[in-house]
């Protein structure tokens, strides 16, 4: 096969470039499959490395074996060491990769095609891979968990593999790992959200409330209930994925890249047959996210999937942002069912603080009295007018614990102030003494 860079995906081109640089650094005139395999296994983001790890292959051991093979390749120095070329073995790998791409109905040669080709082309690295338990069937079996039913139809196709994993956080996993704070109260709102999620159509709740009233906490509470099995039968197997819009937009330099990522993510959610519920915090960011002049924004990509009921979604935004962005877009607004989240009463805030007390005690290493929790709820409600419960009460407790810990670990503030004043006066006294000595000597 004549080497044509335009037939390769961006990631595959990067791997080939890295292989060329590795060959140069080792003073090898020919670029061999060993160079390519070494750079692919050494890059944790490369799908070849991820497939090998999924197959439970000791990647570091395999990498050291490949590097030993590279050291055996003849070195060329002096006047004859001009120019680099692709070896006949690597040419065979390219031919096999092209056949693999055609067989998988892909339009470009990507990293996984090269990886399969290296195990199949009958070159030296094929034996190394087979000895490590990596062959075509094993790779293809694992590949579906990365690609699903996706095909390589663009040069950036590898960017869209496992989109859900890259651009969202699985709240169910965080609950199992104990990374989320317990959610106390909010039973009415949680029940209303579960009721909307159980509907056949228009099953997309949007939580509307002021900043700090606990909209995200409600969704975390639902994830905790799903993990605990305390939900209707039709929601017991569901996973909640919190979308990271910043990660989705980051690095999209060229027009169409953002849309491609989002479409891949939506396709992955659709392929789960309703098992994944997407949580979009700051829902208003979707209106206009990724849009440049003449291109679609994220909301327009989501609308068809929401309308057909193929995408189940929970949104969260403030009342002002909802009115400014979402209410104006009637087509988007009618896809969602609103759930108003008011700030809790002082009594409910005290209950929430009691539930969080243990987490803060462990973090700060101090004991929190119940009277302090009641005082935090009452005083924050009375004196902090521009913030909302329970957020401002939680902040008060956190701030007080932090201050107490600081005083325990270091000198008390009063003593520290007196010591600093003493040091300042001592420096002043020394300066005056030197001045007096100087005038005395004159």
Swiss-Prot record:
<keyword id="KW-0677">Repeat</keyword>
<feature type="binding site">
    <location>
        <begin position="209"/>
        <end position="216"/>
    </location>
    <ligand>
        <name>ATP</name>
    </ligand>
</feature>
<feature type="region of interest" description="Repeat 1">
    <location>
        <begin position="8"/>
        <end position="73"/>
    </location>
</feature>
<dbReference type="Pfam" id="PF17871">
    <property type="entry name" value="AAA_lid_9"/>
</dbReference>
<feature type="region of interest" description="Repeat 2">
    <location>
        <begin position="86"/>
        <end position="149"/>
    </location>
</feature>
<keyword id="KW-0346">Stress response</keyword>
<comment type="subunit">
    <text>Homohexamer. The oligomerization is ATP-dependent.</text>
</comment>
<dbReference type="InterPro" id="IPR003593">
    <property type="entry name" value="AAA+_ATPase"/>
</dbReference>
<keyword id="KW-0067">ATP-binding</keyword>
<dbReference type="InterPro" id="IPR003959">
    <property type="entry name" value="ATPase_AAA_core"/>
</dbReference>
<dbReference type="InterPro" id="IPR027417">
    <property type="entry name" value="P-loop_NTPase"/>
</dbReference>
<feature type="region of interest" description="NBD1">
    <location>
        <begin position="162"/>
        <end position="343"/>
    </location>
</feature>
<keyword id="KW-0143">Chaperone</keyword>
<comment type="similarity">
    <text>Belongs to the ClpA/ClpB family.</text>
</comment>
<keyword id="KW-0963">Cytoplasm</keyword>
<keyword id="KW-0175">Coiled coil</keyword>
<dbReference type="GO" id="GO:0016887">
    <property type="term" value="F:ATP hydrolysis activity"/>
</dbReference>
<comment type="function">
    <text>Part of a stress-induced multi-chaperone system, it is involved in the recovery of the cell from heat-induced damage, in cooperation with DnaK, DnaJ and GrpE. Acts before DnaK, in the processing of protein aggregates. Protein binding stimulates the ATPase activity; ATP hydrolysis unfolds the denatured protein aggregates, which probably helps expose new hydrophobic binding sites on the surface of ClpB-bound aggregates, contributing to the solubilization and refolding of denatured protein aggregates by DnaK.</text>
</comment>
<dbReference type="InterPro" id="IPR036628">
    <property type="entry name" value="Clp_N_dom_sf"/>
</dbReference>
<feature type="region of interest" description="Linker">
    <location>
        <begin position="344"/>
        <end position="442"/>
    </location>
</feature>
<dbReference type="InterPro" id="IPR004176">
    <property type="entry name" value="Clp_R_dom"/>
</dbReference>
<feature type="coiled-coil region">
    <location>
        <begin position="394"/>
        <end position="442"/>
    </location>
</feature>
<protein>
    <recommendedName>
        <fullName>Probable chaperone protein ClpB 2</fullName>
    </recommendedName>
</protein>
<dbReference type="InterPro" id="IPR041546">
    <property type="entry name" value="ClpA/ClpB_AAA_lid"/>
</dbReference>
<dbReference type="GO" id="GO:0005737">
    <property type="term" value="C:cytoplasm"/>
</dbReference>
<keyword id="KW-0547">Nucleotide-binding</keyword>
<dbReference type="GO" id="GO:0034605">
    <property type="term" value="P:cellular response to heat"/>
</dbReference>
<feature type="domain" description="Clp R">
    <location>
        <begin position="5"/>
        <end position="149"/>
    </location>
</feature>
<dbReference type="InterPro" id="IPR050130">
    <property type="entry name" value="ClpA_ClpB"/>
</dbReference>
<dbReference type="GO" id="GO:0005524">
    <property type="term" value="F:ATP binding"/>
</dbReference>
<dbReference type="InterPro" id="IPR018368">
    <property type="entry name" value="ClpA/B_CS1"/>
</dbReference>
<dbReference type="Pfam" id="PF02861">
    <property type="entry name" value="Clp_N"/>
</dbReference>
<dbReference type="Pfam" id="PF00004">
    <property type="entry name" value="AAA"/>
</dbReference>
